[in-house]
Swiss-Prot record:
This is Short-chain dehydrogenase anuD. Belongs to the short-chain dehydrogenases/reductases (SDR) family. Disruption phenotype: Does not affect the annullatin D biosynthesis pathway. InterPro entries: NAD(P)-bd_dom_sf, SDR_fam. Keywords: NADP, Oxidoreductase. One of its GO terms (molecular function) is oxidoreductase activity. The active site is at 244 (proton acceptor), 244 (proton donor), 248 (lowers pka of active site tyr). NADP(+) binds at residues 84, 109, 133, 158, 244, 248. The keyword NADP applies. The lineage of its organism: Eukaryota, Fungi, Dikarya, Ascomycota, Pezizomycotina. Highly reducing polyketide synthase; part of the gene cluster that mediates the biosynthesis of annullatin D, an alkylated aromatic polyketide with a fused dihydrobenzofuran lactone ring system that exhibits potent agonistic activities toward the cannabinoid receptors. AnuD does not seem to play a role within the pathway. The gene is anuD. It comes from Penicillium roqueforti (strain FM164). Its EC number is 1.1.1.-.
Length: 381
């Protein structure tokens, strides 16, 4: 006889009843009291529910194969020479994308990826390889300049790093630089090209930030300090084992802030630029190759037990840029809009206050990198 009791998880159109004794035990046995009202079932902590929700998504949900037609469209993917970025590129080629810009830190590796994609899909003359080092603001600004006159229908901001080593890059801890600061530097610098594309081709471009469901693990108490980024840049205080999920929490909050900023500065006579963020789920990729020791081993075990393939993860990238304006300012999970998958902190009033404060801090940092960048958030009359 089991002493633990069932917990009900609702995701999408279905319910899952599991036994929870903490956050590690998962069973799909159906108990005798399955028919009881959910209100009679025991409550568990937010952390436990988040873990169970994650397991449900990883084990029982498979994002659908995308079918949206991208004919005539140009899509940029950062971090596209391997992993889910590479698989998203393969899906887009299958879905008739007319121009695919692969942005990779190494032009050589980017070209190898392009050659492989052409062989796999039989499509040639579609891929354009561009060098982009997200750890270097000059590389980011040069890339944005090269894109100024391009038609751009969608930007998938997928490039990111996962490391437990505290390393400086562009005057900030490298995870913050790559996953957050320079990612938003690029997003804002591309706005003029996106607005030009919107007006010229009567389209509604999309910027999509690849986040992570691991953002639910932390509530970022540092947001209450005078300068959050300064605290996160303190080597002595840095908790690097938390840095990746914290960077993704920052990315989600700031993506929502950016969407709000664009809403307050709508363009004249054209549709708004769509901004969203999403989780691809936990996928087998090279992202954790720089994580070693017991944490690396734990992540390896988790990958073996629950991880999606990069092909399945790549589906979520394509889904994020195919949702249309209904996804503006929203969060996607398993390939569809799912605000309930956000952490309680993000959805709380405290989360909104943190979002507004962090946006101000981010813009101060970006103004130092590119004076006047804030003006790009408002369209030219």
């Amino acid at each position: 006889m089991r002493n633990d009791r069932p917990v009900r998880i609702t995701r999408g159109s279905g319910d899952l009843y599991v036994y929870a004794t903490g956050i590690t035990t998962l069973s799909t046995n159906f108990p005798d009291d399955l028919g009881k009202s959910p209100s009679t079932l025991p409550e568990i902590s937010t952390a436990s529910m988040s873990a169970l929700s994650f397991l449900y998504s990883q084990l029982f949900v498979e994002p659908p194969v995308p079918t949206h037609d991208f004919q005539g469209q140009t899509v940029i993917i950062t971090g596209s020479n391997r992993g889910i970025g590479f698989e998203a590129a393969r899906h887009l080629l299958r879905l008739n994308v007319s121009r695919l810009i692969l942005a990779a830190r190494s032009a050589e590796k980017g070209q190898i990826a392009a050659d492989t994609l052409e062989q796999l899909t039989g499509r040639s003359g579609v891929i354009q390889v561009e060098e982009l080092d997200m750890a270097n603001q000059e590389s980011v600004q040069e890339f944005a300049t090269r894109m100024e006159m391009c038609r751009i229908d969608a930007v998938l901001l997928n490039a990111g790093i996962y490391t437990h080593d505290f390393v400086w890059a562009d005057n900030h801890e490298s995870t913050l630089t790559v996953n957050v600061i320079n990612t938003f530097l690029l997003a804002i610098l591309l706005l003029p090209a996106l607005r030009r594309s919107s007006k010229t081709w009567v389209i509604q471009p999309c910027i999509s930030f690849v986040a992570s469901d691991r953002h639910v693990m932390y509530d970022l108490p540092e947001w209450k300090t005078q300068n959050t980024f300064q605290v996160l840049n303190d080597r002595q205080q840095a908790r690097m084992h938390e840095r990746y999920p914290i960077s993704k929490l920052l990315e989600i909050l700031l993506a929502r802030a950016m969407a709000k900023q664009l809403d307050s500065n709508p363009p004249n006579g054209t549709g708004n630029i769509i901004v969203n963020s999403f989780t691809p789920g936990y996928c087998t990729s090279g992202l954790i190759e720089n994580v070693h020791g017991i944490t690396g081993f734990a992540l390896w075990l988790l990958s073996k037990a629950t991880a999606r393939t990069t092909e399945v993860g790549g589906r979520t990238l394509v889904a994020a840029i195919a949702q249309g304006d209904k996804s503006h300012g929203k969060y996607l999970n398993d390939g569809h809009i799912d605000e309930s998958a956000l952490s309680p902190f993000v959805r709380s009033q405290e989360g909104i206050l943190a979002m507004e404060k962090l946006w101000e801090e981010l813009m101060e940092i970006l103004e130092q990198k590119r004076p006047g960048i804030g003006l790009l958030l408002s369209p030219v009359p």
